[in-house]
C-alpha cells in the first residue's frame, strides 16, 4: 500500500496519511442511490449500538460477491475507496464487456483475474474449494452455494484451507474459528487488501466524525439513568460485583451466540472471545 504523507501545513495533515493508489469515483452505473444508515438506532429510535451518528452521506457500491463470470478474464482498472466498508474495491473490465466491482485483493494492481473450476491458484482468482490445494490463503468465502461470499471480507481478512474430507472442507477463519463448509462453495485466492487500516492515522477527530463515529464515553462517568455504572459521588466504583453493559447484561466475555443454531454441528472449534 503506497502511503502518501502530506506537507505539514496544519496539525491534521501533519499527522494524517493517504493511500495515493486509491481513487474516488461517484459516476458509475455500479454506484446506486444514497445508502441510509441507522445511526445506531432501531426502528423505534432507541439506541442499540452506541457511539454512532452523523457522518457524511454515502453512495452504495454494488459489489460482485458471487464472481459468476465463469472462464472470462477480467483486468483490474482502478482501485477505489468505498465508504461502506474498510476494505478497498477494484473495478474489473471483463472480456465480454461486463464491468463489476470486487473486493481488492492484497498487492494486485493492473493484473488479470478469472473465475473457473480449473484456473491457476493465483492471487485474485476465484474457484471452488474442491479445486484448491491445502494451505491456500483465501477470502470472500461462500457459506451457501451460489449465494456469494459471506466470510473473510473485511480489510486484511484471510482464511486458510486446512482439510478436505468427503463433501466438506475445513477452514480456519480470521476469528480463529474452525468450521466445515461444502467443497462446492467458491472462494477467492489471497488476502483482502488495505491491511494496515487499523494502524493508519486519520490526523484529526473530524475525519472520525465523517465516518459516523462519535466519542466513546465511560459508563462510570454517566448518570444512573444512562448506564448501570453511573452515579455516585466523585470517582465512585461501579457499585456491582461485575461490569455490565448499558442494558444490564454481564460484560467482559459473555457468550452472545444462540445455543441451538443449525450450524453448531459445522463448527469444530469456537472462536476465542
Curated annotation (Swiss-Prot):
The UniProt entry, under Gene3D superfamilies, shows: 2.30.30.30, Nucleic acid-binding proteins, Ribosomal protein L2, domain 3
GO cellular component terms given for this protein: chloroplast; mitochondrial large ribosomal subunit
For biological process, the GO terms are:
mitochondrial translation
How does this polypeptide assemble, per the annotation? Answer: Part of the 50S ribosomal subunit.
Q: What is this protein called?
A: Large ribosomal subunit protein uL2c
Q: Which UniProt keywords apply?
A: Chloroplast, Plastid, Ribonucleoprotein, Ribosomal protein
Polar residues bias: start-end ranges = 1-31
InterPro entries in UniProt: NA-bd_OB-fold, Rib_uL2_dom2, Ribosomal_uL2, Ribosomal_uL2_bac/org-type, Ribosomal_uL2_C, Ribosomal_uL2_CS, Ribosomal_uL2_dom3, Ribosomal_uL2_RNA-bd_dom
> Is Plastid a UniProt keyword of this protein?
yes
Under Gene Ontology molecular function, one entry of this record is: rRNA binding
Quote the PANTHER family the UniProt record gives.
LARGE RIBOSOMAL SUBUNIT PROTEIN UL2M (PTHR13691:SF5), RIBOSOMAL PROTEIN L2 (PTHR13691)
Write down the SUPFAM superfamilies for this protein, in alphabetical order. Nucleic acid-binding proteins, Translation proteins SH3-like domain
Q: Where in the cell is it found?
A: Plastid, Chloroplast
* Entry's family note: Belongs to the universal ribosomal protein uL2 family.
An example Pfam family from this entry, by short name, is Ribosomal_L2_C
Span list, region Disordered? 1-53, 222-273
Keyword Ribosomal protein attributed: yes
Amino acid at each position: 500500500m503506497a502511503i502518501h504523507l502530506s506537507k505539514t501545513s496544519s496539525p491534521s495533515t501533519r499527522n494524517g496519511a493517504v493511500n495515493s493508489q486509491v481513487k474516488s469515483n461517484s459516476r458509475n452505473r455500479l454506484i446506486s442511490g444514497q445508502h441510509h444508515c441507522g445511526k445506531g438506532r432501531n426502528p423505534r429510535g432507541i439506541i442499540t449500538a452506541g457511539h454512532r451518528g452523523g457522518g457524511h452521506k454515502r453512495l452504495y457500491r454494488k459489489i460482485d460477491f458471487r464472481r459468476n463470470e465463469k472462464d472470462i478474464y477480467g483486468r483490474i482498472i482502478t482501485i477505489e475507496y468505498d465508504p461502506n466498508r474498510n476494505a478497498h474495491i477494484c473495478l474489473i473490465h471483463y472480456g465480454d464487456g461486463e464491468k463489476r466491482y470486487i473486493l481488492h485483493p492484497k498487492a494486485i494492481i493492473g493484473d488479470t483475474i478469472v473465475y473457473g473450476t480449473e484456473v491457476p491458484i493465483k492471487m485474485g482468482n476465484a474457484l471452488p474449494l474442491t479445486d484448491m490445494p491445502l494451505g491456500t490463503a483465501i477470502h470472500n468465502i461462500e457459506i451457501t452455494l451460489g449465494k456469494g461470499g459471506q466470510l473473510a471480507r473485511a480489510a486484511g481478512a484471510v482464511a486458510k484451507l486446512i482439510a478436505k474430507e468427503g463433501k466438506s472442507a475445513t477452514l480456519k477463519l480470521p476469528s480463529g474459528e474452525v468450521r466445515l463448509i461444502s467443497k462446492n462453495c467458491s472462494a477467492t485466492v489471497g488476502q483482502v487488501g488495505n491491511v494496515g487500516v487499523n494502524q493508519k492515522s486519520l490526523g484529526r477527530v473530524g475525519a472520525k466524525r465523517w465516518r459516523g463515529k462519535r466519542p466513546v464515553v465511560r459508563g462510570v462517568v454517566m448518570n444512573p439513568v444512562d448506564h448501570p455504572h453511573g452515579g455516585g459521588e466523585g470517582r465512585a466504583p461501579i457499585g456491582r460485583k461485575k461490569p455490565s453493559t448499558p442494558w444490564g447484561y454481564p460484560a467482559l466475555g459473555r457468550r452472545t451466540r444462540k445455543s441451538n443454531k443449525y450450524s453448531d454441528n459445522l463448527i469444530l472449534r469456537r472462536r476465542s472471545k
